[in-house]
């Protein structure tokens, strides 16, 4: 196995945010991308510079906004939603990797 991709939605303020997270074979984040952002504000979470801070994270990593993850002024709900979604995806991928190895 080379890696995994995880596609999901999180709820923004009023609309879903569709995102993808890419993992290596050990469950570490290799990249992430906002596929579709539907809210009128807060679209800065689609910026690849912001998304790059998830690189190398796993389910064991810290995801505290303001220290581990940069906040974005005016995009608090979107930042929280995407961060929670990516963190959740790391748990799902870890579970899948454990199941594969059993």
Task: Put a short name on every predicted segment.
Residues 1-80, 84-102:
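Flexible, solvent-exposed loop/hinge segments and secondary-structure transition points
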